[in-house]
Structures are given as structure tokens and as C-alpha cells.
């Protein structure tokens, strides 16, 4: 599962105890929270010992009495003991995201800012190909080391 930051919220599905839930990926949440209206009535819950901070005023906060089996969006095995309260959508917190191997990456640009300015002045449009009809290569050519130990490309 992957999601680019955009106007759309990063939402993914998880299966908890065989039941599918959809939730918002929330790296700012310490724990995962299931919306009270989505919590199955036959699943046990108890009043939470601690409150929730950062989601506004939650009057009733519960927690699952059991540690539950969970499958992440790409079938990652995990366990969770979620909090339960009246929120509009489920939140997948760091307790699950860490078990799923979630990462936040910000790729470095392929070219330096100086080379980008030079290319732009020469008429290059990002995302378009090189050449008169903008149909040429769109990604840089990678240098390959010559493993035969002869000719161009052989590291001395």
C-alpha cells in the first residue's frame, strides 16, 4: 500500500478479528482508535483508564478488553488493543503502523536546483520527454559498471 500526499486523506483497510475496517493513516496518533458506531456490539470493551488527547472532547472512551489479531493493508500480521470512542472515522495509529512497517519518505530531487534551472531555460517541461516533440526519455539514464574489467566503464 502506498499513498502520495494530496488533497485526499490517506485511508487504507485493515482486517481485525476477521472484520474489515477502513481507517485514516495517522502518524500523529500514538494508538489506533475505532469509531464507536463501527465497533461490533458482541466484542467486549471496557471504560478506558486514560483519556484521549488531540481529538477534541471525547465524552466516552473505551478500550478493547482483548488484544486483537489484525491484518494490515498488505496482509501484514499485527495485534492491536484499540481505543473506542465517538469519532467520524477510524484512525490507524503508530501502534499498528510500526507493526506494518510503515515509512514516510521524501525523495530527493533527481537533479540539483542549478541543473533544473538550466534545463527549464532550455525549454524543458518537468514530466515531459526531451526532444522537439517532448516524446523522448523522461527519466535519467543510469550509469552501469562494466563487470568484464575492460573498456569504458571499468573502475580502475
From Swiss-Prot:
Gene3D superfamilies: Acid Proteases. Residues 111-156 form the G-patch domain. The active site is at 26. Autoproteolytically processed at the N-terminus. Expected C-terminal autoprocessing not detected. The sequence shown is that of the processed Pro protein. SUPFAM superfamilies: Acid proteases. One of its GO terms (biological process) is proteolysis. It catalyses: Processing at the authentic HIV-1 PR recognition site and release of the mature p17 matrix and the p24 capsid protein, as a result of the cleavage of the -SQNY-|-PIVQ- cleavage site. It is an enzyme of class 3 (hydrolase). Its EC number is 3.4.23.50. InterPro entries: Aspartic_peptidase_AS, G_patch_dom, HERV-K_Pro_peptidase_A2, Peptidase_A2_cat, Peptidase_aspartic_dom_sf, Retropepsin-like_cat_dom, Retropepsins. Keywords: Aspartyl protease, Autocatalytic cleavage, ERV, Hydrolase, Protease, Transposable element. Residues 21-96 form the Peptidase A2 domain. Pfam families: G-patch (PF01585), RVP (PF00077). SMART domains: G_patch. One of its GO terms (molecular function) is nucleic acid binding. Active as a homodimer. Retroviral proteases have roles in the processing of the primary translation products and the maturation of the viral particle. Endogenous Pro proteins may have kept, lost or modified their original function during evolution. Insertional polymorphism. Provirus present in 29% of tested individuals. Belongs to the peptidase A2 family. HERV class-II K(HML-2) subfamily. This is Endogenous retrovirus group K member 113 Pro protein. It comes from Homo sapiens (Human).
Amino acid at each position: 500500500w502506498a499513498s502520495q500526499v494530496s488533497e485526499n486523506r490517506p485511508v487504507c483497510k485493515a482486517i481485525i478479528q476477521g472484520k474489515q475496517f477502513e481507517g485514516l493513516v495517522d502518524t500523529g496518533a500514538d494508538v489506533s482508535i475505532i469509531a464507536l458506531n463501527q465497533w461490533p456490539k458482541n466484542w467486549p470493551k471496557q471504560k478506558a483508564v486514560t483519556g484521549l488527547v488531540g481529538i477534541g472532547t471525547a465524552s466516552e472512551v473505551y478500550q478493547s478488553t482483548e488484544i486483537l489479531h489484525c491484518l494490515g493493508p498488505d496482509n501484514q500480521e499485527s495485534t492491536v488493543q484499540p481505543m473506542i470512542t465517538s469519532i467520524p472515522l477510524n484512525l490507524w495509529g503508530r501502534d499498528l503502523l510500526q507493526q506494518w512497517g510503515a515509512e514516510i519518505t521524501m525523495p530527493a530531487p533527481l537533479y540539483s536546483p542549478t541543473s533544473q534551472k538550466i534545463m527549464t531555460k532550455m525549454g524543458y517541461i518537468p514530466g515531459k520527454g526531451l526532444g522537439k516533440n517532448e516524446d523522448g526519455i523522461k527519466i535519467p539514464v543510469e550509469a552501469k559498471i562494466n563487470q568484464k574489467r575492460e573498456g569504458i566503464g571499468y573502475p580502475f
